[in-house]
Amino acid sequence: MLPTTSAMPIGAIIVSARPADDCLAHFALTEADLLRGPVLDCPGGASDFAVRIRALGGRAVSVDPAYDAHPERFAERLRADLERVRAWTATRLDRFPPGPDGRWHRLPSWEHAAETFMADYRRDRDEATGHYVSALLPTLPFPDRTFALATSGFLLFTYPDHFDQAFHLGALRELLRVADEVRVHPLNDSARNPYPHIAALLEALRADGVHVDTLAVESPTDRSDTHTLRLRRPALPAGCTE
């Protein structure tokens, strides 16, 4: 039997333009949380999340392998991926209800986020701000504990057909190497299937001394994405440095 349309994942990895407000909801964060220290968004995609953090007075770096592209090439891919999102959500109206124009009602906010991101991405390329770094998990070009917080949305657990269990563990350990706290959302793929190896991953992380818990969230994107993983490194003893 073939799976139903709703049960089929989105397929190839997309560069998504998730709005900053959605990211706050996904990761169970407040704007005040974003000012505790430097923030890493990995993968950053075309979200305006890091732009919001900097507008608030915080520090943020976005990492994505797509950032090796010239802005015009990036914009071309972004337009294509937004069209993929439009087409995919149009066949799943029970999960992604349409707005007045017949498209998924959240798509205009994605398009606005994409415009904000592209303006900032072009500025980064013109001024070498260092806000957008091309890199690929599980190897990040930052020293240990560079960031107070790392957020990782819609990559880990979302594409189990692209990344095996070893990749997931390596990626989580690398995020924990560079950040004191890591939040990952969601814990299922785009067809709502829970990640099958999450128990084994969390057991391995606990063995590393990582504090693990899950946070209940309400996703503005898909109401089935109800949990976020929070990982915290053990604090260094007083007077110790790495």
Where is each model-derived feature located?
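A short, conserved alpha-helix within the catalytic core of class I
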Residues: 159-174
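Residues lining the SAM
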Residues: 153-157, 185
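Class I SAM-dependent methyltransferase Rossmann-like catalytic core
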Residues: 1-37, 48, 55-56, 68-79
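Conserved SAM-binding strand-loop segment of SAM-dependent methyltransferases
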Residues: 128-140
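Class I S-adenosyl-L-methionine-dependent methyltransferase module
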Residues: 55, 59-130
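Conserved beta-strand signature within the Rossmann-like core of class I S-adenosyl-L-methionine
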Residues: 171-188
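A short acidic, Gly/Pro-enriched loop at the edge of an enzyme's catalytic core
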Residues: 138-151
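Class I S-adenosyl-L-methionine
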Residues: 190-242
